[in-house]
Amino acid sequence: MKKDELIKIAKNFSIDGEPIKIEKCNSGHINKTYAITYKTKEDEQKKYILQYVNTNVFPNLPELMTNIKKITKYMNQKATEKGENTDRLTITMIDTLDDNPNSIYNENWRMEEFIDNTKTYLTTESMEILEEAGKAAGKFQKNLDGFPAEELYEIIPKFHYTPNRVNQLREALSSEENNS
């Protein structure tokens, strides 16, 4: 996507400043992701993540965003009550100017604050990195303790239902055997 098109899209979000730099993030395989640096009125630079959400995987962005907002609000409130720092605990979503993520050219775009000093790993053989990933997943689960899951939308039906996933794997293997 061209830089001027991305800037036009980015200007649909509630950010005080002007986009000055755009970099494509090549990690990930579902969504198209860009890092955008803004120059603020205070002449500082602040970085954000602009993401085109793949509608084949996530057809209903408003429901997905509602889930994200509910979960991050819950986790931040819980951490604040414990006196913990919330700066790096969750992502911070940026609202669109009209509070409708589907309104940007009838496509699914979202933006969040960039978390400095982070790194993405698509694969690793490092036991240390795997251990840290496990700790992060465990901490996420612990921070969700008590969250009313029934308030969430089911974004991908039966995605976390293990018997369904096993059946999908068996079907894929069977299909692969039949095509060989």
In which residue ranges do the predicted regions lie?
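Juxta-kinase regulatory segment immediately upstream of eukaryotic protein kinase catalytic domains
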Residues: M1-E23, M75
